[in-house]
From Swiss-Prot:
Catalyzed chemical reaction(s): 6-(2-amino-2-carboxyethyl)-7,8-dioxo-1,2,3,4,7,8-hexahydroquinoline-2,4-dicarboxylate + 3 O2 = pyrroloquinoline quinone + 2 H2O2 + 2 H2O + H(+)
Family listed: Belongs to the PqqC family.
GO biological process, one term: sulfur compound metabolic process
Organism: Azotobacter vinelandii (strain DJ / ATCC BAA-1303)
Protein name listed in UniProt: Pyrroloquinoline-quinone synthase
SUPFAM superfamilies xrefs: Heme oxygenase-like
Function: Ring cyclization and eight-electron oxidation of 3a-(2-amino-2-carboxyethyl)-4,5-dioxo-4,5,6,7,8,9-hexahydroquinoline-7,9-dicarboxylic-acid to PQQ.
Pfam family, one: TENA_THI-4
Gene name linked to the record: pqqC
């Protein structure tokens, strides 16, 4: 027997309920906003999240490439400009580089991606590859972890300056700009998702896709926790060198 589709309001509530699994609840994140993280842990997080930041425009470009709807493309392309920047405008990637400098990382070291852990790289690459293979509607819906993003950005702005006075204030610009951008992106992404996933089967699939994205964010922090909290980076039993691949073979 076919189940009745959720109403748009019910479906939105189901999507928002996934916030219970957002990475704001990961112990590594909790430690950061409670002021228990070391400088090495903060720097490790910034360096690894940079790989996520530079891949977001690739994810969004994949969505645009698969989308035949001009009106959707006109609105979605703003996400790429937000990260890459436009004429005379600094983008989010540049803002993240300044965050890296604010926590004491070398800009060239960030750009080299030499600190990116394999587990983080695999998780981010899985997200980009999903966006390339999936329908544009499914890939757009996977971005709805942004429903929960303003809370995590605000928590950093509220707690990090107090707990980590050694971080230069200019580094927080990325989080401030994303507060506004994420809310705008959520409105568009939610509109697409509620319009295109109208059967119970499609809604169930979209909820599973959103869980997939949550799994990616959580898995990234699992890799960082192993390396920076438990002092068990890859190959720690045989070497202290960062011997893992840098993505250049893929």
């Amino acid at each position: 027997m076919t189940q009745t589709a959720m109403s748009p309001a019910e479906f939105e509530r189901a999507l928002r309920a996934k916030g219970a699994y957002y990475h704001i609840h990961h112990p590594f994140q909790v430690a950061m906003y409670e002021g228990r993280s070391t400088r090495e842990q903060i720097r490790g997080w910034v360096a690894n999240r940079f790989y996520y930041q530079v891949n977001i425009p690739l994810k969004d470009a994949a969505i645009l490439a698969n989308c035949p709807d001009r009106e959707v493309r006109r609105e979605w392309v703003q996400r790429i400009l937000d990260h890459d920047g436009g004429p005379g405008e600094e983008g989010g990637i540049e803002a993240w580089l300044r965050l890296g400098e604010a926590v004491g990382l070398d800009r060239e070291q960030l750009l080299s991606q030499e600190l990116v852990l394999p587990g983080v790289r695999f998780a981010v690459d899985a997200y980009v590859n999903f966006a390339r293979r999936a329908s544009w509607q499914e890939a757009a819906g996977s971005s709805l972890t942004e429903l929960f993003a303003p809370t995590i950005h605000q928590s950093r702005l509220d707690t990090w300056p107090r707990h980590y006075p050694w971080i230069e204030a200019g580094g927080y610009d990325y989080f401030r700009r994303r507060l506004k951008e994420a809310r705008r992106d959520v409105e568009h992404g939610l509109r697409i998702t509620l319009a295109h996933f109208a059967t119970r089967e499609a809604q169930a699939r979209m909820l599973e896709i959103l869980q997939f994205k949550l799994d990616i964010l959580w898995s990234m922090l699992d890799a960082m926790s192993m390396a920076y909290e438990l002092d068990r980076p890859p190959y720690h039993t045989v070497t202290h060198e960062r011997v893992w691949h840098r993505g250049t073979i893929l």
